[in-house]
């Protein structure tokens, strides 16, 4: 885990799994991988404000929910929180959790090896580790923009690492059994995402675009915000781009070729 600006926190709402966009796709992935038990002990590694735990809570009302992050949430109403510094050992006993989830977090980690070791330690034998991580390394649009500015996505997305799919699978398989992998952010989705965040560096329009994305106007990830988002031109473009990327990812979700997003379900043996 690593710190990021408070404006990147999108609240304690649950993402809508019925929406035909990329956040909805991630939400459905989580729900599909939940254990059958009605009262699992669940840890969110990099919990933020708890939107994915909220989703778990809606599906498993009896679950006990805990979250860790480098920054305290504004209002953890329905989960127990532990503040943990980056690369600090998790404050839990070995073989504790039935399920660990982590969405869009490992790319921010200072040391993915240590992060995965700790997740493996606190997960009970037979427990599941479920989440999503970008795989922006290797050839593709992200590599092109990194040729122009090696730190472009560290500056605009707070991504400390650009993993390849092979690297991620190596990290996973050395600790866990891979149960299921699916893929997203393929050719069109990756290009749109890479261009969008690279645009933050443009001299005139870039700062305005970045303020929109990180500021209070950005309702894109909120559960019922599609109409509010479309009221601005930029918001409409973001909505359109996500819809296009969603349909591409849905069509190619079993195809790793060109994919820059990995949805994973792992178990501890």
Identify the function of each model-found stretch.
Residues 1-93, 99-103, 116, 145-147, ...:
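Conserved N-terminal segment of class I S-adenosyl-L-methionine
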Residues 3-21, 113-118, 128-267:
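S-adenosyl-L-methionine-dependent methyltransferase catalytic module, highlighting the catalytic core
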Residues 73, 108, 136-139:
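Active-site loop signature of alpha/beta-hydrolase-fold enzymes
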Residues 103-106, 132:
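Residues lining the SAM
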Residues 91-93, 110, 164:
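GHKL-family ATP-binding catalytic core of two-component histidine kinases
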Residues 109-110, 123-125:
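Helix-to-beta-strand junctions that scaffold the AdoMet/dcAdoMet cofactor pocket
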């Amino acid at each position: 885990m690593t710190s990021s600006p408070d404006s990147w926190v999108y609240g304690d709402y649950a993402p809508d799994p019925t929406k035909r966009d990329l956040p909805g796709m991630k939400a459905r992935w989580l729900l599909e991988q939940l254990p059958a038990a009605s009262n699992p002990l669940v840890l969110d590694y990099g919990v933020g404000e708890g939107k994915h735990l909220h989703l778990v809570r809606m599906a498993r009302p009896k679950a006990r929910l805990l979250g860790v992050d480098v920054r305290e949430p504004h209002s953890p109403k329905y989960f127990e929180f532990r503040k943990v510094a980056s690369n600090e050992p998790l404050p839990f006993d070995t073989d504790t959790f039935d399920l660990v989830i982590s969405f869009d977090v490992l790319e921010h980690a200072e040391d993915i090896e240590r992060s995965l070791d700790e997740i493996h330690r606190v997960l009970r034998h037979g427990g599941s580790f479920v989440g999503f991580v970008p795989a922006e390394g290797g050839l593709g649009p992200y590599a092109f923009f990194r040729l122009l500015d090696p730190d472009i996505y560290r500056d605009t997305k707070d991504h400390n690492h650009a993993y390849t799919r092979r690297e991620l699978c190596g990290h996973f398989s050395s600790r866990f059994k891979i149960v299921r992998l699916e893929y997203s952010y393929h050719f069109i989705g990756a290009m749109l995402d890479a261009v969008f965040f690279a645009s933050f560096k443009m001299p005139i329009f870039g700062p305005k675009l970045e303020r929109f994305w990180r500021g209070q106007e950005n309702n894109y990830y909120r559960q019922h915000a599609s109409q509010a988002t479309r009221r601005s031109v930029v918001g409409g473009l973001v909505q359109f781009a996500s819809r296009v990327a969603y349909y591409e990812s849905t069509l190619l979700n079993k195809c790793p070729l060109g994919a820059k997003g990995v949805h994973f379900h792992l178990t501890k043996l």
